[in-house]
Curated annotation (Swiss-Prot):
One of its GO terms (molecular function) is ubiquitin protein ligase binding. This is BAG family molecular chaperone regulator 5. The fifth BAG domain is responsible for the interaction with HSP70 nucleotide-binding domain. SUPFAM superfamilies: BAG domain. It comes from Mus musculus. Co-chaperone for HSP/HSP70 proteins. It functions as a nucleotide-exchange factor promoting the release of ADP from HSP70, thereby activating HSP70-mediated protein refolding. Has an essential role in maintaining proteostasis at junctional membrane complexes (JMC), where it may function as a scaffold between the HSPA8 chaperone and JMC proteins enabling correct, HSPA8-dependent JMC protein folding. Inhibits both auto-ubiquitination of PRKN and ubiquitination of target proteins by PRKN. Binds to the ATPase domain of HSP/HSP70 chaperones. Binds PRKN. Interacts with HSPA8. Interacts with JPH2. Keywords: Chaperone, Repeat. The gene is Bag5. The lineage of its organism: Eukaryota, Metazoa, Chordata, Craniata, Vertebrata. PANTHER family: BAG FAMILY MOLECULAR CHAPERONE REGULATOR 5 (PTHR12329:SF2), BCL2-ASSOCIATED ATHANOGENE (PTHR12329). Residues 9-86, 95-167, 182-260, 275-350, 365-442 form the BAG domain. One of its GO terms (cellular component) is junctional membrane complex. SMART domains: BAG.
Amino acid sequence: MDMGNQHPSISRLQEIQREVKAIEPQVVGFSGLSDDKNYKRLERILTKQLFEIDSVDTEGKGDIQQARKRAAQETERLLKELEQNANHPHRIEIQNIFKEAQALVKDKIVPFYSGGNCVTDEFEEGIQDIILRLTHVKTGGKVSLRKARYRTLTKICAVQEVIEDCMKKQPSLPLSEDVHPSVAKINSVMCEVNKARGTLIALLMGVDSSETCRHLSCVLSGLIADLDALDVCGRTEIRNYRREVVEDINKLLKYLDLEEEADSTHAFDLGQNHSIIKIENVLKRMREIKNELLQAQSPPELYLRAKTELQGLIGQLDEVSLEKNPCIREARRRAVIEVQILITYLDLKEALEKRKLFPCEEHPPHKAVWEILGNLSEILGEVLSFGGNRTDKNYIRLEELLTKQLLALDAVDPQGEEKCKAARKQAVKLAQNILSYLDMKSDEWEY
């Protein structure tokens, strides 16, 4: 149809569709709950668009009626997706775990409010357990769930970091107030900073409705101004003491800035953690080796070199500091599996190549197991290349292929031969490991 002669109703519907399309990324990425302000805003916009679509006059014309129907269906699809994101069972699971963390903070964070820095083992263990459970919430690669899990995890990890930083400091300071008149003021500021830690944690966890990030930021900035105004008369030990307290305040201000920017930035980005960076560097090299192996025309000559380097990567992962952080533990666990499955792929390929070079008489059941191992080798090559989620056709196909191999192994009768029994057992374990790896790959981990 000539754009110049396009019916006004069609033009209006196209305009509404453009507006709906523009808001789609916000709907797809919505990671909150149905009582969030942003949920209500998106719901209101989409509902308004539906009313706008409904009010377009079709004049009884079929093409306009079809265009209006398509526009309404697209808008209704986004409304449904918004509702599903907010009410997804795993989103509710994330929120329930976060509520447990809130209850723990309310119950155990009193020492911070009183100006001390005594945190019970029960609190530390509770936070560790909560973070670990969050890392195991399945997202199925869904953007909204990954975002919700990431946001919740990083908030709680920030709380853990604030607490651990406070616990490990234990300086020889504060100084005696007899040393210099300024020391009394620095000591009182340090007490205020300890209290501010408790307030910050309560803010991060959403358990203090009487305080705001902005107000606490002003209070902390005021404390820095008070410290800057002190005359320390060139006394090195007092100047160092003041510097330590200022550094503590600046750390707390950093968390406040991140919390205020949380909706628009990668707040508390665990990806900047030095242990995570080490893990990422290992994974980067592992992917390079994997691509080289999967693309090689004649890979056998690469096997030994690749396997030696991969075993070295496992050694590097063993040296990564976990820092008592379950997120780092989970990241390392996944990285170890990624490297180990590639070593398994190489071992299997090598074994199959050797069998071709040195054929021998085999018991029929044993031969059947080897044929299945050959199938598993091909499937594992595909799984290593797979990068989708559980809804992908390729995921379903690979899962079905692996299940068929397990059924085929179950049907093999070793006829009492021990060697065949052991081979079948090993093949079953391999198929199960590939299935587990496929499951892990489809639930992409984010820091």
